[in-house]
Amino acid sequence: MSRTNFDTLLEAGCHFGHLKRKWNPAMAPYIFMERNGIHIIDLHKTVAKVDEAAEALKQIAKSGKKVLFVATKKQAKQVVAEKAQSVNMPYVIERWPGGMLTNFPTIRKAVKKMATIDKLTNDGTYSNLSKREVLQISRQRAKLDKTLGSIADLTRLPSALFVIDVMKENIAVREANRLGIPVFGIVDTNSDPTNVDFVIPANDDATKSVEVILDACCAAMIEGLEERKAEKIDMEAAGEAPANKGKKKSVKARLDKSDEEAINAAKAAAFIKEDEEA
């Protein structure tokens, strides 16, 4: 049974493409007709493509891997954030940080900096700083959170990208292509589908259109997550839970309180210096 249907997509306006003069010829297989100078997308093909993408996303979620959602256009930002959070997946809805994938270690370093600042806030280090210094560090934390807060849990490269408007997010698509990361995308008639592994031909400018497609895909991912959870419970019940191999022993640093405070103060000073140089 299909995860969506023709009528649902039609009601959401998924069939509306762009003006004929703006079309990309590579989208010809997904165009049903032209009406009043506007291309109309073949929703029967959209239904099939949504099913195909949803099944693949379900398997990714079931395997415990991450899908990074990307949508920086105004119409899609809020709905993408909500849907990504519903399946506990990372997302980017502000400016795409160049090198997000191809220079991932640097991005992770910035995310770790956020965690360090949070630690300084909680352990009392801030009480030894002036109001100006606290403000500088807080400003730096807010700046990092705006662009990277939604990917704080992404400890390794994602297993797939889900992009809304592949033309607007072309840098993200190119980075994923370079690293061999599969790309799922809602592709309108003005975009090039050749760099997208799972093409979902649909209107990428209407919030409702984006929402109904994400509803179907995220429902499949939730199924995958639930199946993964059920399998884990069954394995534990059968006494077949895999042993945690190669588990590293935690090594506690034997520092007295004064040494720890000195290290934290040095970290805070480094953050203040970075803010002044920025």
UniProtKB/Swiss-Prot annotation:
Superkingdom is Bacteria
Task: State any GO CC term.
Answer: cytosolic small ribosomal subunit
An example of a GO molecular function for this protein is: structural constituent of ribosome
Q: Where is this region: Disordered?
A: 233-257
Q: Which UniProt keywords apply?
A: Ribonucleoprotein, Ribosomal protein
Its BP terms in the Gene Ontology are: translation
Iron-sulfur: is it a keyword of this entry?
Answer: no
Q: Which family does it belong to?
A: Belongs to the universal ribosomal protein uS2 family.
NCBIfam families documented for this protein? rpsB_bact (TIGR01011)
The protein's name in its UniProt record: Small ribosomal subunit protein uS2
